C-alpha cells in the first residue's frame, strides 16, 4: 500500500523540532551555569593570588618603595589566569600596573553576555591596623578574558555536539516506538482492510492487536468489529427471506451452497445426502395446497427427528431435501443414516382422511477434502437421480465402491451382533501351568466363534473387524460377563482358580469401564485375586496416565492386572517409564520371543531381567517344545501356557480335564 505522505516522516519531523527546541533551551541554561561556575572558580583563584602578595605589597607601599612594589607585582604567577595586576589608590589613582598576558580581542556580545573580564579588588592595609582600618590602596587582579572566551566556545561546542547526538538518538528512539506501537498496527489494519475480498466485507472482524487490548487502537478495532457485527446482522435480516424456503423455513439451495463452501474450506470429512421425496411430487394437483403444506411440514419434522444437532437440513426444491451430515466419517455411517431416514419417512401418514405412505430416494456423496462445493453437490444430485431410477426407497452412492464398502461393513456388523444374539460366540480356556510340576495355576479366556461346519475357531482378522465395526466394547463386555459368570459358578463349588481375560485399549479407555467392571464384580461376588485383566500391550494406549487412573481402582477392588504380549508395542524402550507407573502384577512374554529359544535368547533374557527388577510374576506364552520349557524354567520363568501343555479347550472339556478332582 502506497501513501502520498508518510506518517513516519511527519512524526519524526515533529519530534525532531520539539527536541531541537528543548536542546537549545537546555544548552543555553547549562552554558550560563557552567560559565558562571567558571567565573566563580577564576575569581577564587584571583583572590588566592592577591592574598599571597597583599602583606609584602602593603609594606612596600607604606615605605613608598615603588621598585619593590613593582617587583612584588612582577613576582605574581599568573598561572594562565591573571592577565593584569593594578595597584589603585583610594582616590582611584592608578599607582602601579603589571601586564602578564597581552590583551586579545573578545567579541563584544560575549563580553556583555558573560560580564567579562573577571576581576577582583582586594584592599591593602597597613601592618598595624587601627580599630577602623582604611585601605591604603587596592590590589586589582584581572583574569584573561580570551581564556574565558575559549572556555565559553569549547563548552558551547561540546554541549551542542553532545545534545545534538542525544537529540538524534532520542528522535530515532521515539519515532521507532511510535512507529512500532502505532504505525505498524495501523498499517496492518489498513492492509487487512484492503485485502478483504468483496464477498467477505460484511461481517469482517479485525484481529485485536496483542499489545493494544485497552488503548485507542484497541478501541478503534472494537468499534469497527461492533459496527461490522451490526451491519452483518442487518444484512442477514435483509437476506434471510431470500435464503430460506418459504413454507418449511429451511435453508434453500443458495444458502446450502454457502454452507457447502464452508465445509469445503474446513476440509472436514462429511457426507452430502440428497433426499428426493417422490410423494411430494406425485401429490401435486391431487392434494390441496394446505394439505401439501401439512405433508411437507410433517415430513420435515420427521427428517429432523433422525438428524443429529450437528447436521444441517435444507430444502432445495419443492420435493428435494439436502442434508450436510456433519460427523459422518465413513460410507457405512451414511448408509445407516439413510436407512433411518427411509424407515421414518415411509411410515404411514394420515392427511385429512387420506392414508399416505411416502417413499423417497437418497443419493450420497462423500467429501474427503478433494472437491469443490459445486462438485460435491453435483455428485450427490447424480447419485439421487440414479437411486430414483432404481426404484422406491433406494440409497445410492456416487462412488459404487463406497456403496459396496458400506454394505459390507453393515453386513459384518449385523453378522457379529447376530452371532452374539444366537449364542454363536463362546469362551474357551487355555491352561496356565507351573513348568516344573505341570500343576494348573490359572487359565486364559479365549474368544471363539462357531463356524458354518459346526466347529469353533477364531478366524484371522476377526478381532480387527470387531474393532472396525465399533463393537469391541460390546463383545468385550460379553466376554467379561461370561468370565465372571464362570468364576461365580466355580467359586460356589469352592474352586478358586483365577481366570485371565484380555482387555483391549478401546475397552480400557471407555468412560464406563470402571463402573461396569465394578458392577460385574459385585453382581457375581467375584473373590479378590481370581480375575486377571490382561492389558494387551500391542494395542496402542494413547494416554498411559488415564490407563493408570482406570486400572488402579480395579486393582483396589481385587482385580489383578497383567501386561500381555510384552515387548510388542506399548512398553517399547521409550515407554518403559510409563510401564513402571502401571499398577501391574503379571508380565506375559509374547510367544514371538519364545519361538526363538533356546538359540535366540538375548531379547527374552532382557525382558526377564526387567520383570525381575520390577518384582513381577512372569508367564511365557506359546511354549511348544521341551527345550523352550527347560530354558525358561532355568531362567526363572515359573508359569507358561502353550501347546506343549494344552491347547485351548471348551469349558466342559477343561472342567473334566482339570477340575474333576476339585
From Swiss-Prot:
The gene is pdeK. Residues 268-400 form the GGDEF domain. It catalyses: 3',3'-c-di-GMP + H2O = 5'-phosphoguanylyl(3'->5')guanosine + H(+). Residues 180-236 form the HAMP domain. SUPFAM superfamilies: EAL domain-like, Nucleotide cyclase. Its EC number is 3.1.4.52. Residues 409-662 form the EAL domain. The keyword RNA-binding does not apply. This is Probable cyclic di-GMP phosphodiesterase PdeK. It comes from the Bacteria. It holds the Pfam family GGDEF. One of its GO terms (cellular component) is plasma membrane. One of its GO terms (biological process) is signal transduction. It is found in: Cell membrane. Keywords: c-di-GMP, Cell membrane, Hydrolase, Membrane, Transmembrane, Transmembrane helix. The chain crosses the membrane at residues 12-32, 158-178. GO terms for molecular function: cyclic-guanylate-specific phosphodiesterase activity; identical protein binding. It is a multi-pass membrane protein. Coiled coil: none annotated. InterPro entries: Cyclic-di-GMP_PDE-like, EAL_dom, EAL_sf, GAPES3, GGDEF_dom, HAMP_dom, Nucleotide_cyclase, Rev_trsase/Diguanyl_cyclase. Induction: Expressed at 28 degrees Celsius in stationary phase.
Amino acid at each position: 500500500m502506497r501513501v502520498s505522505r508518510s506518517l513516519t516522516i511527519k512524526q519524526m519531523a515533529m519530534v525532531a523540532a520539539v527536541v531541537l527546541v528543548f536542546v537549545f533551551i537546555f544548552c543555553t541554561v547549562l552554558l550560563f551555569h557552567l560559565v558562571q561556575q567558571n567565573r566563580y572558580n577564576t575569581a577564587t583563584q584571583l583572590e588566592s593570588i592577591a592574598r599571597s602578595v597583599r602583606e609584602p605589597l602593603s609594606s612596600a607601599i607604606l615605605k613608598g618603595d615603588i621598585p619593590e612594589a613593582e617587583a612584588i607585582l612582577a613576582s605574581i604567577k599568573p598561572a594562565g589566569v591573571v592577565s593584569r595586576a593594578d595597584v589603585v589608590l583610594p582616590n582611584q589613582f592608578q599607582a602601579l600596573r603589571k601586564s602578564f598576558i597581552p590583551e586579545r580581542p573578545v567579541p563584544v556580545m560575549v563580553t556583555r553576555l558573560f560580564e567579562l573580564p573577571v576581576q577582583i579588588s582586594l584592599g591593602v592595609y597597613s601592618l598595624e591596623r587601627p580599630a577602623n582600618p582604611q585601605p591604603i590602596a587596592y590590589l586589582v587582579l584581572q583574569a584573561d578574558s580570551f581564556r574565558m572566551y575559549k572556555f565559553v566556545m569549547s563548552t558551547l561546542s561540546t554541549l551542542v555536539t553532545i545534545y545534538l547526538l542525544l537529540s538524534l538518538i532520542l528522535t530515532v528512539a521515539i519515532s521507532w516506538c511510535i512507529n512500532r506501537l502505532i504505525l505498524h498496527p495501523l498499517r496492518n489494519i489498513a492492509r487487512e482492510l484492503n485485502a478483504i475480498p468483496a464477498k467477505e466485507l460484511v461481517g469482517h472482524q479485525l484481529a485485536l492487536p496483542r499489545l493494544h487490548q485497552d488503548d485507542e487502537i484497541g478501541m478503534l478495532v472494537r468499534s469497527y468489529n461492533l459496527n461490522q457485527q451490526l451491519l452483518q446482522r442487518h444484512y442477514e435480516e435483509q437476506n434471510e427471506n431470500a435464503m430460506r424456503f418459504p413454507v418449511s423455513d429451511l435453508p434453500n439451495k443458495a444458502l446450502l451452497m454457502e454452507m457447502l463452501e464452508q465445509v469445503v474450506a474446513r476440509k472436514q470429512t462429511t457426507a452430502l445426502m440428497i433426499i428426493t421425496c417422490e410423494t411430494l411430487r406425485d401429490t401435486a394437483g391431487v392434494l390441496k395446497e394446505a394439505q401439501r403444506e401439512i405433508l411437507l411440514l410433517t415430513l420435515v419434522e420427521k427428517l429432523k427427528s433422525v438428524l443429529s444437532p450437528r447436521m444441517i437440513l435444507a430444502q432445495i426444491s419443492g420435493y428435494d431435501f439436502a442434508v450436510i451430515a456433519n460427523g459422518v466419517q465413513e460410507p457405512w455411517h451414511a448408509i445407516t443414516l439413510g436407512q433411518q431416514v427411509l424407515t421414518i419417512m415411509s411410515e404411514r401418514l394420515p392427511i385429512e382422511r387420506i392414508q399416505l405412505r411416502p417413499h423417497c430416494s437418497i443419493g450420497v456423496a462423500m467429501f474427503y477434502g478433494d472437491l469443490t462445493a459445486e462438485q460435491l453437490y453435483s455428485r450427490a444430485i447424480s447419485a439421487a437421480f440414479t437411486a430414483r431410477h432404481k426404484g422406491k426407497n433406494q440409497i445410492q452412492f456416487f462412488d459404487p465402491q463406497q456403496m459396496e464398502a458400506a454394505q459390507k461393513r453393515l453386513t459384518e456388523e449385523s453378522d457379529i451382533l447376530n452371532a452374539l444374539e444366537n449364542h454363536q460366540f463362546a469362551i474357551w480356556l487355555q491352561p496356565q501351568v507351573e513348568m516344573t510340576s505341570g500343576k494348573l495355576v490359572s487359565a486364559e479366556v479365549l474368544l471363539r466363534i462357531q463356524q458354518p461346519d459346526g466347529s469353533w475357531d477364531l478366524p484371522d482378522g476377526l478381532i480387527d473387524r470387531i474393532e472396525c465395526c465399533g463393537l469391541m466394547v460390546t463383545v468385550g463386555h460379553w466376554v467379561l460377563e461370561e468370565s465372571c459368570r464362570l468364576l461365580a459358578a466355580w467359586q460356589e463349588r469352592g474352586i478358586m482358580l483365577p481366570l485371565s481375560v484380555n482387555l483391549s485399549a478401546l475397552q480400557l479407555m471407555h468412560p464406563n469401564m470402571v463402573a461396569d467392571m465394578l458392577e460385574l464384580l459385585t453382581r457375581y461376588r467375584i473373590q479378590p485375586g481370581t480375575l486377571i485383566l490382561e492389558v494387551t500391550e500391542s494395542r496402542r494406549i494413547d494416554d498411559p496416565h488415564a490407563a493408570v487412573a482406570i486400572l488402579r481402582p480395579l486393582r483396589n477392588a481385587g482385580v489383578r492386572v497383567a501386561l500381555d504380549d510384552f515387548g510388542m508395542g506399548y512398553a517399547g524402550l521409550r515407554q518403559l517409564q510409563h510401564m513402571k507407573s502401571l499398577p501391574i502384577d503379571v508380565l506375559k512374554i509374547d510367544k514371538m520371543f519364545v519361538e526363538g529359544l533356546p538359540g535366540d535368547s538375548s531379547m527374552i533374557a532382557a525382558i526377564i531381567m526387567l520383570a525381575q527388577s520390577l518384582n513381577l510374576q512372569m508367564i511365557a506364552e506359546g511354549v511348544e517344545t521341551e527345550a523352550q520349557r527347560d530354558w525358561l524354567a532355568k531362567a526363572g520363568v515359573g508359569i507358561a501356557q502353550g501347546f506343549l501343555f494344552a491347547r485351548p479347550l471348551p469349558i466342559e472339556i477343561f472342567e473334566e480335564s482339570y477340575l474333576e478332582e476339585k
